[in-house]
Amino acid sequence: MAEITAALVKELRERTGEGMMDCKKALTKAGGDIEKAIDDMRASGAIKAAKKAGNVAAEGAIALKEDGKSAVLLEVNSQTDFLALQDDFKAFVAASVEKAFADKLTDAAPLIEAQEADRLVLVGKVGENVNIRRLVRVEGDVVGGYLHGNKIGVAVVLKGGNVELAKDIAMHVAASNPEFLLPSEVSADAIEREKAVFLSLNADKIAGKPENIVENMIKGRISKFLAEASLVEQAFVKNPEIKVGELAKKAGAEIVSFTYFKVGEGIEKPVDNFAEEVAAQLAAAKQ
């Protein structure tokens, strides 16, 4: 019998929309054969919500739980923004982040398993696909977080300073979404890509200019890029006269890390074509 790995269970869950435990049982019964497991689940009527499970859940909410020394950021997805505003969904999100924080979870997998029964009840009640997508736990000397509505969440870890400062920096991150903490973290590839973009966009301005002038123009653009992309080099949103790194230093603090979550980030949303959908339905009706 093939080994029932977590990856195999995850694949079956993604293909059927069923719970992790149900998928594990089906795979065990099928001897690790995923196609047989799917056939068995279909034959037994276990895949009742296949249509819902196939729907992309790219809306939802970000939840944050913190205590000054640690924080949990959690993303739970729904199919529509409307559901994300409903009490049943909010209650599920709140219960999930509370459990993740209390159990000191550092990964979404155990939370998904623990909340699966409640998730299925919610899906059955609201008629939409709902998924716990990702979870991050951070710990440190000083930890502060910020939620922008329920769509963006940030957790900042400091060495020194205080929670209020961490929260202020987290708010800045939510507004500015830096890619890196320090300029030194920016990869050579990222710098080369920025250089290529600059040269492409400014081909007319550069044409005919001496090489040393072009090099200075490139250096200026790269310096600006590093400042825009690095948290410590960005102008603080509440006081643009000071950089975020300087703000922390004046408070006797060092920014250790930041974590940024935005609802649906990286999820490819389907683009519905109403005309094609109607045409397909009419064609099916004629058959």
Curated annotation (Swiss-Prot):
The organism's taxonomic lineage, starting at the top: Bacteria, Pseudomonadati, Pseudomonadota, Gammaproteobacteria, Pseudomonadales
Biological role: Associates with the EF-Tu.GDP complex and induces the exchange of GDP to GTP. It remains bound to the aminoacyl-tRNA.EF-Tu.GTP complex up to the GTP hydrolysis stage on the ribosome.
Residue numbers spanned by region Involved in Mg(2+) ion dislocation from EF-Tu: 80-83
Cross-referenced Pfam families: EF_TS
GO molecular function terms attached to this record: translation elongation factor activity
Species of provenance: Pseudomonas fluorescens (strain SBW25)
HAMAP family, alphabetized: EF_Ts
NCBIfam families (UniProt xref): tsf
Swiss-Prot/TrEMBL keywords: Cytoplasm, Elongation factor, Protein biosynthesis
Signal sequence bounds: none
Record-stated family: Belongs to the EF-Ts family.
GO cellular component: cytoplasm
KW Protein biosynthesis (keyword) present: yes
Tagged with keyword Transmembrane: no
Compartments (UniProt record): Cytoplasm
PANTHER family: ELONGATION FACTOR TS, ELONGATION FACTOR TS, MITOCHONDRIAL
Gene3D superfamilies, per the entry: 1.10.286.20, DNA helicase RuvA subunit, C-terminal domain, Elongation factor Ts, dimerisation domain
Protein name: Elongation factor Ts
